[in-house]
Amino acid sequence: MEKSEKGNGVAPATRSPMALMGSSRNENQEVNTSMRTAETMLRLVPMALGVAALVVMLKNSQSNDFGSVSYSDLGAFRYLVHANGICAGYSLLSAIIAAVPSPSTMPRAWTFFLLDQILTYVILGAAAVSTEVLYLANKGDSAITWSAACGTFAGFCHKATIAVVITFVAVICYAVLSLVSSYRLFTKFDAPVNYPSKTIEATVFHG
């Protein structure tokens, strides 16, 4: 009876290596699931922003006694529409891929890293050039004979400003995604190992 009681008292205090490995594996799976869910949501946010900016700009046109203007009249705004459409499509596709449980391989990490970087610069360029056009439309520039048009087409400029602001928010999301994909890629590489030079040490001792 004493042995059995001692045995019962010791058993809960000790855990087998297999049990420890199983618990750590479950914890890793929970962490991976949480990270996968967070990344999926982070990739869906710029998709929604891109669609919103695209729709606002597509519907942006105004007519009055002075004439009519549409987003298609300006190359910068056409670029903004195309860039938001491409980025929204990529965000949806990458979110679907990120949501699927699969091992993170080196080719996959490189693909996400490169595409996230490219799309970040694409959407940033669209937002920047559209901002310049909006500035000229508001302030004008006599040096290039560009007159201020927002006083005449205030509604058009207002919608264009909304689309550009939404695009800049999408740029922030893509910048965060670029950091995440960079981290996932470069953590797969081993840290450099410093090998001490025995020749130098020997020279120092003999000197």
UniProtKB/Swiss-Prot annotation:
It is found in: Cell membrane. The keyword Transmembrane applies. One of its GO terms (cellular component) is plasma membrane. Residues 1-37, 101-108, 181-207 are cytoplasmic. It comes from the Eukaryota. GO terms for biological process: seed trichome differentiation. The chain crosses the membrane at residues 38-58, 80-100, 109-129, 160-180. Residues 59-79, 130-159 are extracellular. It is a multi-pass membrane protein. The keyword Membrane applies. Homodimer and heterodimers. Belongs to the Casparian strip membrane proteins (CASP) family. This is CASP-like protein F16. It comes from Gossypium hirsutum.
